């Protein structure tokens, strides 16, 4: 183990996803041999990243402006929303040139074992965009409001938030948000494009139950062709194009 500033840099790089101690050490040693102006340029870029990048107030995509370029594009189909887990998934879909609607970034997927329930995701702003109201039981308690079981058939004597809304037994509450929208286009379709793994499938099923009773709204899921257990980020364009073409209703 190194000491002092070098070890501090190694420790910081080790905190980044996908970078282990050995990779962090190689990066730190490489930076140690760089010219001072290169180090300053790297530091400047990190500073600009923190100061100059924000999240779109409409879709929560990474943006340099209050509204991202996709939401600001008048040529995009405003009646369709594609729901993804992370901003990186938008980049993958855009490369296919198959989709011309707008997006909504959840900021993750349901993972109750790690304390991620609906309240930790951008579910409420999604419903706000559609123009409806949430059942007061739909979001649940922090960190545990939704379990992977919520996406499946409820146990005897129990009902999900969407089922309760369906039978009229749940109270509804207006969606509270600080976001003000310049326009409220009619949404006719929501495409669920979460990753085809356990958490992504649970999230898709949860959203399908939550949104399926909105009048005039079709909720679809990307079709087969994307391998189970994979990440959307690594799917090739042809496979993703076929998945979009063959999407089915939930």
UniProtKB/Swiss-Prot annotation:
A zinc finger (C4-type) spans 56-71. The keyword Zinc-finger applies. GO terms for biological process: DNA recombination; DNA repair. SMART domains: TOPRIM (SM00493). Keywords: DNA damage, DNA recombination, DNA repair, Metal-binding, Zinc, Zinc-finger. Residues 148-172 are annotated as: Disordered. Disulfide bonds: none annotated. Residues 79-227 form the Toprim domain. GO terms for molecular function: DNA binding; zinc ion binding. It comes from the Bacteria. The keyword Ligase does not apply. SUPFAM superfamilies: Recombination protein RecR. Gene3D superfamilies: 3.30.60.80, 3.40.1360.10, 6.10.250.240, RecR Domain 1 (1.10.8.420). PANTHER family: RECOMBINATION PROTEIN RECR. HAMAP family: RecR. Belongs to the RecR family. This is Recombination protein RecR. The lineage of its organism: Bacteria, Bacillati, Actinomycetota, Actinomycetes, Mycobacteriales. The gene is recR.
